[in-house]
Amino acid sequence: MKTLSLIFLFWLVITTDSSAAETDRFAVEKDVTATFLKDMSVTYRPGVGLEGRRCLDGRLPGKDAEMIEFWASLECSYCGIRELVKAQQEHPDWCVVVRHIPASPEGLRKALSFEALRKFSTSAALTFWDAVIPKKDSPMPRPYEGALIQAYADAAISEADFSAALTGDAADIVDADTEAGRGIISSTPTYVLRGIRFGSCDFTAKQLERALDLARRARTGDPDAAREVGEVITRGRMGEKML
């Protein structure tokens, strides 16, 4: 009898956990669908709101560039920059625009520093990002101050030059992003592809290609692509393999 009771209790725990997981997935799917329909109801206008912003490699976007927004916090361990740099290098017709949604004072400080460094050296700024972002396989990113000192050397600038940029263009960019993302970006990283928000999606360069293709097809009214977009975002939100 005791053995049967333990088996029943074990079954009950498993069933409860399974039901809870199904309930969570249903709630996520419902939210993803509502967000997708809202995004699709808005006419996609590439580049609107991104005037004057530079691509990840430092270029200004061409007239027909494929605009990709990457919303991130530099306190987010899933907001690494390496795969995104690879994607930008492999697709010169794309323009990947970093947008900031800092979740803490430390994240704000890092975002401002990144944008200030970009004014002098794209390479130094990207190296700084990679150094200070928390790594999924390591709980200890490089100390902010040490990474910044190295960035001064990489960009061949003085602390005074950096400080001037910090309170000028960098502050304007980060403030504008924070305001634009309020109430729209709820998780990081979030990609915006053809005006569709892919929240909590940590894409590799190859996965980003596939996600962009799905977004393009969804915008043409392809129902299979629209369904798959929803599935990809749901899996991202649930911490599952996306593509």
Specify the residue positions occupied by each region the protein language model found.
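N-terminal targeting signals for export/organelle localization
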Residues: 2-50, 224-243
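The N-terminal extracellular segments of secreted preproproteins, especially immediately downstream
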Residues: 4, 54, 75-78, 94, ...
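C-terminal cap of thioredoxin/glutaredoxin-like
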Residues: 25, 71, 150-243
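Extracellular/mature segments of secreted proteins
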Residues: 46, 62-65, 85-87, 209-211
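A short beta-strand-turn-helix
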Residues: 46-68
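A generic local structural motif
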Residues: 53-57, 84, 177-179
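General secretory precursor processing signal
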Residues: 58, 79-82, 204
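Structural alpha/beta surface segment adjacent to cysteine/selenocysteine redox centers
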Residues: 66-153, 226, 231-234
